[in-house]
């Protein structure tokens, strides 16, 4: 295939993918204008709200067990309120995608999330999700002259006009390395707000630290208990200052999985905590389940369902009822029935009827009937309507879907005909592509795609023309890779190598040191003394700076490191800070500078290598040295427990230096999954996306670092094909054309499937990411091949 046709087809694939995504993830159509009271508006307008003030405390990623289960919760003060009846607790189901932006939309508008919001969630300067023109709980508060103050996650300030707030102070939501200052910047406002309660009617606090701890160390991080106690003390500080006319609501916007990530649809991610706090509640009856329970609950539930379960969007009509506001027009929520007790019976009946008529307007053709229906009957009917609305919350753009799919089919036919040949390599490529394409029609195969890649990789290895001894070595290496991490979304195994090494830190860290040194070996192969000296200095600085950073990073995150490496890191930081008495608490100050020094050394090393080749005509092992610099970057962007996998990679490449394109394709995909990646947004790793980034968030820098950290193993194996012929490139392009075509057809055919948003949509996003990855790697391989 000619070069021009290759680039035309590569461009056509990207255009087709983004056209299809544009049709599959359109902006949701919403009802315009603000809502008004529907049933007996004169009675409702004349009624007084149950509460005069609201304190809304959002603790990001507060999973239900963090509040209600004994082994996972340290909210001692809140537990006391739950047991005394002054607090009513619920497990609030948060619809996927379980990331902050769509969940905040859900708890303020009551509407179902748009999957596109999960992507926009990482765009710091995005304004397309603004709710200025959409009816919401905050807009109703503003319209009815409630004074609102806000402190916390600045996502709120992107969603709502600043004129909604009398006072506000936003904190950055994506600098996940920080889980102390980000919460202190919220709590420091609390004393003043409590002393000047006349200055506000609604106080919103959004804490991010717990979520950041989850991203860094998982749901069982040893930082969790202290963070729980910190949040509990904030709740106590506020609750003891407010009176009976103030309602306090504590909730999580979503939960998290055991790895501390979120975005998917697992029980841990969708089960958020919710609690209503007021001294008045003691006079009424909480849910039957709460009355028969003692909080914290002894037994741990694998589905994270504690106390009574409600929909998270039910908060919207419930708060609207308690503050006598019209329910936002697009709300799909249903009033939480226990809280109806706080209203006079006649007014409570009116509020339920109002909720019923408002909800039925969202379902075209539904005949609303109020006559002779009790409040209980209406609530039950509303929950059925709510369920059906959630299933049909998206309007697809079929024109874009058709164009995107048609372009993919045309591209697939062209690249298949052009590449056609009766060779083993071609048959292996087509067989792999067809097998993966068929799997796109089954949600379980998408969730467990790593199983398919494992089977294909082993099959391709057995067909390779290498000695049995080499096959045995490669097979052993692949088995170690296979058993290193938990992969997929369905099963979690306790005895994986990743977990075992974490409990044997000395073995882990000395393997890490050996891995860093092995990556630098190409620098030691030189022809003359001057080249040898420059190479030795380069590899020394690269290895020392990267190892030092990873050790410091581990110490700051509370991970154990061998005493010798601990002392080395402490002395390194003492030298940098010019402070001989530096302690462990000072190490965090060195993280950003050390990472930046490392990246600067990488840049200088590349410049020196290019200078020596083109100016001094000294280019011994030039390509491998450039690849070594890239590998050092990949190691820095990899979690400490996964770094030894690169040592296995180095062994495999030395055993099979001439890797075939199909085997490289298999390894790119297999290692992506075996590093812990999946087809769920929940496993997008942000931990290393901030290496060298200060609190001045830069989405482009973070985006590149996030790309490197999530695709590090795949990048390694893609770079194994230098130089790469256009025949090899087109075979890879053919694979992604075939699988992409099947995925698009599957998404259209299964657009009303139960798992369309939790399985197929994330897979489509990952496919788009893989398409971009291929373009980037193609450019990088071409550039390195020229050098």
Curated annotation (Swiss-Prot):
How does this protein lie in the membrane?
Multi-pass membrane protein
Q: Which Pfam families match?
A: Phosphodiest, PIGO_PIGG
Give a GO cellular-component term.
endoplasmic reticulum membrane
- Pathway assigned to this chain's UniProt record: Glycolipid biosynthesis; glycosylphosphatidylinositol-anchor biosynthesis
Keyword Oxidoreductase part of the UniProt annotation: no
Q: What is its EC number?
A: 2.-.-.-
Q: Name one GO biological process term.
A: GPI anchor biosynthetic process
Q: Where primarily located?
A: endoplasmic reticulum
User: Glycosylated residues?
Assistant: 33, 185, 397, 485, 581, 617, 669
| Key words of the record | Endoplasmic reticulum, Glycoprotein, GPI-anchor biosynthesis, Membrane, Transferase, Transmembrane, Transmembrane helix
| Record's subcellular location | Endoplasmic reticulum membrane
State which residue ranges cross the membrane. Answer: 400-420, 426-446, 455-475, 504-524, 536-556, 591-611, 629-651, 671-693, 699-719, 740-760, 767-787
GO MF annotation terms: CP2 mannose-ethanolamine phosphotransferase activity
Extract the Gene3D superfamilies matched here: Alkaline Phosphatase, subunit A
- Summary of the function given for this chain in its UniProt record: Ethanolamine phosphate transferase involved in glycosylphosphatidylinositol-anchor biosynthesis. Transfers ethanolamine phosphate to the GPI second mannose.
Family the UniProt entry places it in: Belongs to the PIGG/PIGN/PIGO family. PIGG subfamily.
Protein name, UniProt field: GPI ethanolamine phosphate transferase 2
- Originating organism: Kluyveromyces lactis (strain ATCC 8585 / CBS 2359 / DSM 70799 / NBRC 1267 / NRRL Y-1140 / WM37)
Specify the taxonomic lineage: Eukaryota, Fungi, Dikarya, Ascomycota, Saccharomycotina
